[in-house]
Amino acid sequence: MATIAQLIRKPRQKKKVKSKSPALHYNLNLLNKKTTNVYSPLKRGVCTRVGTMTPRKPNSALRKYAKVRLTNGFEVLAYIPGEGHNLQEHSVTLLRGGRVKDLPGVRYHIVRGTLDTVGVDKRRQQRSAYGAKKPKPKS
């Protein structure tokens, strides 16, 4: 426990809140090659690798992921949600924050239905999260 004299000399410091998605917090100005600390909810990037990964201990699956180089120069791992995808090596994608609990190092999700990523086919429920269009009513 600190004494009052010690606290007067050097007060307690606030804990710094660390971001869970740091790649979304930086913008790169290519004209003067400087980064600015401005948060953006989504970032555009180009896939450099697309593959599958096995999850942590109690779970078992082949989860789809992509390594994406963002417009600010960061290279991150992103999860591809939904069944089936059309992403290849040079596909342009949109990323949002949000980790996948059982995949180590994956802190971002790819937004389905934007840019080069198509929505999930034949999706009926929670369509907006997977970029699926409203199905035509049967007449």
Curated annotation (Swiss-Prot):
Keyword tRNA-binding found: yes
Family: Belongs to the universal ribosomal protein uS12 family.
A GO term, aspect molecular function: rRNA binding
Role of this protein: With S4 and S5 plays an important role in translational accuracy.
Region (Disordered) residue spans: 119-139
GO cellular component: ribosome; small ribosomal subunit
Subunit structure: Part of the 30S ribosomal subunit. Contacts proteins S8 and S17. May interact with IF1 in the 30S initiation complex.
One of the GO BP terms on file: translation
Pfam (any one): Ribosom_S12_S23
Key words, A-Z: Ribonucleoprotein, Ribosomal protein, RNA-binding, rRNA-binding, tRNA-binding
Gene: rpsL
The name this protein goes by in its record: Small ribosomal subunit protein uS12
